[in-house]
Amino acid sequence: MSFPNGIYGKYGFEKDTTSSQKHVLGTRMELPDGRVFRYSEIGGADIAAGAVVQAAAGVAHDQDLVVAAASAGDTTVTLSGSLTITKDQYKDGYMHINSGAGRAGQIYRIKSNTAVASATGCVLTLDEEDGLETALTAGSGNTEVGLSVNTYSNVRLQQ
């Protein structure tokens, strides 16, 4: 099975815009002359052709988050801290494990997430068939995770 992260396009494809997602964010497209473009989602106002853009800033309160217990092989992780997160805010982004014996340094791609508003219980669905490599333990001082949006999500004009 193949999972290409690059496509080849014809001249003019770099100008295509869509109102719904057609590729994985960050997909690399190369034109016949060697120019390369990345499939991105624009945040806020329209951006003129040729403008230099940058990734959205990270969300400070979405680091060092406490999780509910999860078993090895699980494909969902529930965050137990009080958060405000919109539905699929972290889609195509990453969950990285900050702490916990034998777990620190692991990273998982996020397939989707539920919305919560100043509440606990945001559920992350991992984009990994085999699920978690090791179990996660609940409670402060045990497993803590951080969330990162996809670099190509909600790009903005460079400041």
Language-model features, listed with the residues they occupy:
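N-terminal low-complexity, intrinsically disordered "leader/linker" segments enriched in small/polar
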Residues: 1-68, 156-159
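Short linear motifs in intrinsically disordered/low-complexity regions
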Residues: 17, 63-65, 75, 114, ...
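N-terminal, intrinsically disordered, small/polar-rich Type III/flagellar export signal
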Residues: 64-70, 103, 108-117, 127-142
